[in-house]
Each structure stands twice: as C-alpha cells, then as structure tokens.
C-alpha cells in the first residue's frame, strides 16, 4: 500500500479540501453534467486487501453514493479494482446518468480491457440519452405551465421533480438551482426542511461544504414541531460533521458526530451510515481530544456508545489510548488503514488523522519521564517485526528522524542524546511549579483573611470608614501587599530548605 500524498505537512494535505464554491475536493464540476471529475486529484493507491466484503459494504448505501464509492474503490484499490468497477457499471446502468457510465467503462478498460463490461453499450447510451432528453423537456414544459397558472404548490412540486430528475442524471448544478427555486414556494416548515435536505445532499456530492454548513444552520434556526426537530437532528449533525471533516476542523467534526442521535439508523444512507458516524467521529476525537475528554465525552457517552458498538475496533483503540496502551491502539488503526483509504470522505484525511494520533501518543508517553531510552520507545511506536526495532535508535532511522522533526517544530520539548541513545525532556520541574503556585495562593489567602478580620473589627468597634481618594488607596494597598508578601517570602524560604 503506497499512499501517493504530498509530504509538505498538513497544510498541503488539506489544501485541496478547503471549502469550495463548487466542485468536490477542490475540483469544479463539468458545466454540462455537473459531474465532479476526480482525474485532476492525485489518487491514493491501496495495494492491500481491505477487511470489508465489497457486496456487504455497498449494500449499506442507497442512491448516488453507491456509484461514487464503488468508483473510488475501483480506481484506488488494486485488489478490488475489477469487481468494484463492474459493480459501478451495473449501478450506472440501473440509472440514467450516461456520463458516469462512460467514466466507469473507461476506468475498467484501463485495468481489465478484456472484460465484457469494458466495452461501451452504445444502444443503452443512445436509448438513455433519448429518454433523458424527453423527460427533461416534459418536466420543463410542465413547470412553465405551473408558472403561468401561478399555483404556488404546483410550482414547488414542479421544481422538486425537475431537481430530482437533474440529480438522477448527474446534472448537479441544475439540480441545485431547481431545488433552490423551491424556496419561494414552500408554505410549511416540512416543505422547507425537505427542500433544505435536498440542497444539502446535492451540495455534499458537489463538495460544496460552505453551502452544506449554511443550509444546516438554516435547518437549525427554522421553527417547527419539537418532534420534527428531533427527527431531523441526527441528519443535521451528521451533515455538519461531514462538512467539518472535509474542512479539516477535526475537533468540531468530532463534536458534531458525537452529538448525532442514534436514531439516525439508515435514514441518511444516501450519504453515510451509522457505521461511518462511529468511524469518522472516533478518529476525529482520537486526533483532537485529550485522554480525559475521550473517556468522558466518547467512551462514557451513552448515546455515542450505540455507534461505537457497530465498530468495536474503534472503541478498543480509544480505550487503549485512554489507558496509555499506545502500541495496541496504533496497531488497530494500522490494520484498518486500507479500509479507510477506500472511504470516499475519509481517504485524503487518513494520513493527517493518523499522524496527529501518533504524535499525541508520543507526547502522552513522554509525560511521566524525564529521560527515556530510544530503544524502549521503538518497542512501542515502531510497528512491524520486533527484530527491526533494535536499529531504530540509530540517528538515520525513520523513528529517530520523526522525533527530531517533532522537536524541531516545537511539538516535543525534549532533546536527543545520540551517544547514550536516550531522549531527555527539557520541561521544567513540575514539583517546583506546583510549590510556587501553592505559596502564591497562600499569600492571597493570608491577605484576604487579614482584610476580612480588619473589616470585622472596624464594624465591631462602631467605626465608620470613609471612601479614600484614589492616590491614598493605592498607597495603602501597596503597603499592605509588602507586609503580607513578607509572610509568603518567609514560608517560601522555609519550603525551599525543606
């Protein structure tokens, strides 16, 4: 397995995932069909066999995402290329999107030119194009009639049918426009919610993450019955999490996926499944939360636990991380790397997420130590055969170079002694810092107690304290601080001697 990703850091890895006005993964759709071409983006080649079974995996999805996922697997996986592309061709022929059928046939011809499916079915193409043109003309003619009659409900339904037609044939730009035109003719909250979800689905397929987020906010802000809002919440949170994942906002994405209600079930399978929520949310949380947050907000979360039960290896990885068992955690993630590299939404974030999780693991491992041998670290963080770990303390080894890189960019506050083969922490003495904080707190406590006693004695004596001028008050406060700091200095000196 050889991920063909740029090595210029997270910025380069995520640069093609910044929110776009249109297109998917930073690629503009075809102006005629609205299709997103992936040929311009560097593909991640996956040589290893994934753990999932293709038919069972794709059966969890509905709608256009089935083809998109099959096509991605077929063009990225050496092991599943032929089977996935054959399934993608069959999926395309079950619909009316001629352009995606031609793409799938071309992709199969590149890897297996002798397969029967690698030849274009010209009759089907011609027949489908005629059907699509006739259907488009009919729907547009009906919509013009509705507009002439000025019946709002008919106009809304006409735009909806036209948008669904454009979406089915892959003209995502026209589908987006048709759904957007429904806005002025929606008369009930349920109509508005239905329209916004259709726009969100098209925006997700286009990779238009700004539009996904803006329409999610509209869904959240619109009124409606409490039961309707509760029904929409899971899909809203999942869509928002997906847009934040693609934007590289992993902590926000984790929060959104964790907030997704388990009632999501299979209601959003045209975009993602409950298993996807568990994987996306778990990986984003591992990459962005500390151990306390992971334990409290993920493992102890009774709601998100329902998702984690669908992907128990994610739950185990998080548990191992929280218990400082970093090697088993990293081994689990590495075992599922091929699966995640074949996921349409996760693929180009896998390297960034894995790097962050690994860096966090190294940081957490070093916290209790002032000095640790490189060999003992290699036993935990160098995955693979144990026989290869003995040479990992060498200055030219990949592991030592990784540590040097983390030290140079300020991630690790440490230095490496290559002569003794140890990593030495340069952090300050935590005990002295705690002692200083306690003594400062004691100073504040003594001063506060003195002021309270003084006020109590003044009131008991029946004296009246008139407001002081600003200058005199400042001088008295400074004099009081000097007197009370002497107590703190004495305690500090005594404490240091002890």
Curated annotation (Swiss-Prot):
One term under GO cellular component: COP9 signalosome
One of the protein's GO biological processes: cleistothecium development
One Pfam family, short name: RPN7
Domain of life: Eukaryota
Matching PROSITE patterns: PCI (PS50250)
Major subcellular site: cytoplasm
Assembly mode: Component of the COP9 signalosome (CSN) complex.
Protein name (Swiss-Prot/TrEMBL): COP9 signalosome complex subunit 1
Species per Swiss-Prot/TrEMBL record: Emericella nidulans (strain FGSC A4 / ATCC 38163 / CBS 112.46 / NRRL 194 / M139) (Aspergillus nidulans)
């Amino acid at each position: 397995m050889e991920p063909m990703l740029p090595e210029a850091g997270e910025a380069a890895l995520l640069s093609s995932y910044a929110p776009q006005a249109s297109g998917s993964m930073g690629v503009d759709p075809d102006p005629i069909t609205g299709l997103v071409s992936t040929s311009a983006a560097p593909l991640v080649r996956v040589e290893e066999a994934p753990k999932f079974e293709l038919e069972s995996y794709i059966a969890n999805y509905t709608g256009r995402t089935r083809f998109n996922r099959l096509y991605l697997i077929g063009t990225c996986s050496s092991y599943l290329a032929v089977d996935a592309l054959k399934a993608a061709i069959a999926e395309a022929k079950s619909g009316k999107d001629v352009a995606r059928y031609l793409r799938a046939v071309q992709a199969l011809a590149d890897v297996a030119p002798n397969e029967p499916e690698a030849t274009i079915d010209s009759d089907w193409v011609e027949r489908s194009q005629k059907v699509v043109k006739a259907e488009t003309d009919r729907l547009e003619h009906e919509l013009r009639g509705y507009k002439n009659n000025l019946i709002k409900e008919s106009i809304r339904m006409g735009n909806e049918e036209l948008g669904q037609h454009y979406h089915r044939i892959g003209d995502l730009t026209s589908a987006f426009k048709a759904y957007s035109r429904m806005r002025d003719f929606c008369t009930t909250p349920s109509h508005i919610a239905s329209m916004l979800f259709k726009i969100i689905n098209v925006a997700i397929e286009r990779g238009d993450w700004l539009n996904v987020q803006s329409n999610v906010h509209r869904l959240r802000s619109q009124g409606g019955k409490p039961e309707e809002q509760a029904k929409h919440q899971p899909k809203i949170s999942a869509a928002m999490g997906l847009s934040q994942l693609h934007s590289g906002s992993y902590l926000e994405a984790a929060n959104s996926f964790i907030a997704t209600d388990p009632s999501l079930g299979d209601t959003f399978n045209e975009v993602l499944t409950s298993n996807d929520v568990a994987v996306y949310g778990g990986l984003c949380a591992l990459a962005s939360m500390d151990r306390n947050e992971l334990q409290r907000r993920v493992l102890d979360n009774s709601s998100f636990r329902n998702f984690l039960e669908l992907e128990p290896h994610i739950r185990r990885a998080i548990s191992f991380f929280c218990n400082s068992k970093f090697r088993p955690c990293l081994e689990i993630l590495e075992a599922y790397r091929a699966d995640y590299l074949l996921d349409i939404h996760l693929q180009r974030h896998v390297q960034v997420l894995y790097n962050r999780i690994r860096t966090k693991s190294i940081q957490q491992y070093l916290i209790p130590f002032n000095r640790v041998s490189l060999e003992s670290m290699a036993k935990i963080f160098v995955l693979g055969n144990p026989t290869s770990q003995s040479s990992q303390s060498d200055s030219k080894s990949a592991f030592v170079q990784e540590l040097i890189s983390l030290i140079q960019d300020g991630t690790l506050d440490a230095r490496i002694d290559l002569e003794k083969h140890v990593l030495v922490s340069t952090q300050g003495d935590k005990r002295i810092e705690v002692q200083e904080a306690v003594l400062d707190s004691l100073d504040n406590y003594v001063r506060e107690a003195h002021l309270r006693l003084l006020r109590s004695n003044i009131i008991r004596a029946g004296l009246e304290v008139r407001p002081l001028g600003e200058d005199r008050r400042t001088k008295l406060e400074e004099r009081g601080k000097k007197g009370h700091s002497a107590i703190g200095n004495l305690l500090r000196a005594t404490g240091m001697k002890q």
